[in-house]
Amino acid sequence: MSRRLILILVLVAMLVKTMAGMESKWVETTYEIKKRSGTSEKERESERLLGVVNPLIKCFRSPCPGRRAISEQT
């Protein structure tokens, strides 16, 4: 019985120590990330839009993966 009690106490102590270590970690907020980065919000937004639009442009220029070209369908 005493071995089981000691084991439980050790496990609880390890759990408490782990939880305390996790809470002490510094978490960076999105505001701090924006402040740290040198690019403005407009630049980031335009890069995000280009990342979405570029695959669509490529898809219109050449057939999308899994699709045949219009000339092949006729």
Curated annotation (Swiss-Prot):
Expressed by the venom gland. It comes from Heterometrus spinifer. It is found in: Secreted; Target cell membrane. GO terms for biological process: defense response to bacterium; defense response to fungus; killing of cells of another organism. Belongs to the non-disulfide-bridged peptide (NDBP) superfamily. Medium-length antimicrobial peptide (group 3) family. This is Antimicrobial peptide HsAp2. Residues 1-21 form the signal peptide. Possesses antimicrobial activity against both Gram-negative and Gram-positive bacteria, as well as against the fungus C.tropicalis. Also possesses a relatively high hemolytic activity. May act by disrupting the integrity of the bacterial cell membrane. Residues 22-33, 69-74 form a propeptide. The keyword Secreted applies. One of its GO terms (cellular component) is other organism cell membrane. The modification Proline amide is found at P65. Keywords: Amidation, Antibiotic, Antimicrobial, Cleavage on pair of basic residues, Cytolysis, Fungicide, Membrane, Secreted, Signal, Target cell membrane, Target membrane.
